[in-house]
Amino acid sequence: MSEPNIFDRIPSQAKQSIIIDAKYLDTKFVPDELPHRKEQINDLVGLIAPVLKGQTIQPITIYGPPGAGKTAAITCIGKEFKRKVAALGKQIPWANINCYGNTSEYSIIRRFCCELEQSNKNIVIPPETGYSITQVYATLERNLENFKSPAILVLDEIDQIFSKKRDGNSTLYRLSSMPIHIISITNEPSFREFLDPRTRSRNNFANSRIFPSYNAKELADILSKRAEHAFRPDSVDSGAMQYCAALAAQKGGDARIAIDLLRFAAQEADREDSSTILEKHVKCAMESLEVSMVAQAIDQLDITQSVLLLAIMDTQPYQNYGAARTGDVYETYANICWRNKERPLTQRMIVTHLNTLEKYHLISMRAKSFGRGGGRTSLIKLTIPNKTVIESLENKIRDYPELKDVIKPYVESIL
């Protein structure tokens, strides 16, 4: 007789899992059809189609909150574009670059060259280090000469290259002067405030498109389509599905949250050895997901937003209203910057970053009037524990060494 295995003690191993195809529960998986995004996709296709005829198009910018289907839509379009180009016997490269993982000018251009290599094997890829920026751009220019038509370049999360210490203006200006059609995707329309005049003149944002948040019904449709392929028949209670959609709608209509929630609920049902996903499993999943969501939200912050979290945390205890005033938060933020030999952004720009923190549910803001002559301000409170802020920012320092000099000394001072 064989020895018992420790994994046999886990209930989910004693029966078949509810999940039969986990890829449909992965937020990175893009199905062939996107529910409730046909109108937006057709609109973008109309803007891009002239490229197939050798025509020049204006830069395209896609705005929208997280999880609104922006990246998924442009991924679907890119897949179909490549198929059409092949059918026409043409060579028009399509490159996707996520600026969150490629924040430096060097890494973006190198990644672009790697993408171009998929369309032409004569492409030269710069080394990971060792070239000057001038050499990298010269290599890109020579690579583009291999194509008769301008390339299409998708810069996803373009706002990331305009974070402090990153010269997004140089990147965008130099790319827009080459034979390239640029498509930008961002959660932050405010990134345009960081553009200098010459960069703005090259990118007039005439072709700007907004993706709205999904509502609860739309999210339920998205989940239903995925559940058809992800789970065994009749393994999801309809009430549980609607509950997932409703919770995600409350979190800003983010489809990724809805999908993650359904996946977590399925795993919870498996752990309980249940053959059906019920509302109680969704409730347990939401508790786990909220912890994960905070970590993910903080992981997406740029250096300014990260320092702002620290400034709010430091200012809040000294306020009479249990919350920090905007002006006081700005003063603390500016002091942190000067202490680290960095020039702070203007208060107007900081308000934009505060709105981003609120959108990620990391802070709450409410207007406060102090009577005649007292003026108005916003009262700001963290919605997460101080310990969570510190731990999450320490993780960012390990992952992104360039944040260390600005954030770590301040983190250490308040531990």
Protein language model regions, located:
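A short, basic N-terminal segment
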Residues: M1-I57, E80, L415
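Mid-core helix/loop region of P-loop NTP-binding domains shared across ATPases and GTPases
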Residues: S2-F7, S12-S17, D21, D26, ...
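Walker A/P-loop nucleotide-binding motif
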Residues: Q55-E80
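Conserved catalytic segments around the Walker B and adjacent sensor/switch elements
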Residues: P59-T61, K84-G101
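AAA+ ATPase "lid" subdomain C-terminal helix
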Residues: A249-A255, R263-T276, Q316-Q319, C337-W338, ...
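Conserved C-terminal helix/linker of AAA+ ATPases
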Residues: E268-S292
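Short alpha-helical segments that sit at the start of domains
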Residues: V291-A323
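Terminal-proximal interaction/regulatory segments of ATP-powered molecular machines
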Residues: Q319-L415
